[in-house]
Amino acid sequence: MRLTKIIPKIFYEDFKDGLHLFVDGLKFKVVYNDAKLYIIIRDDVTIQLLEDAEYAAKDRPEIRIETDDIAAFYKEVKEAHPELLHPNLNIVKQQPWGLKEFALLDKTTVCVIIQQQ
């Protein structure tokens, strides 16, 4: 038996903010949606977006997504939606702990760090 993935839930007051970050900015595809839930997928990564103002006010997460080609991923984001790049990590940076990283930040302060080993 083994664990195969983690699927985060991210709460938004308004879905459009999450869809801008993940669908427009990171090119996730919507595979399901209803009045309170979107399930989005890109490659092997699945995320659930939930519309709930109470929980959105309580939790603005930071998540990490690993890629095998950070330069191409960065180029894709920078060309399509540079406004989503995090002001504190808006270039690909080699970190002292061995990862290459850049980050995105939406207007609700959900942070997504893209990393490569």
Regions found by a protein language model. Give the residues of each.
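Short beta->alpha transition motifs characteristic of CBS
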Residues: 9-11, 51, 95-98, 103, ...
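Conserved active-site tyrosine of GNAT-family acetyltransferases
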Residues: 18-24, 77, 109
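Conserved acetyl-CoA-binding loop of GNAT-fold acetyltransferases
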Residues: 25-30, 81-83
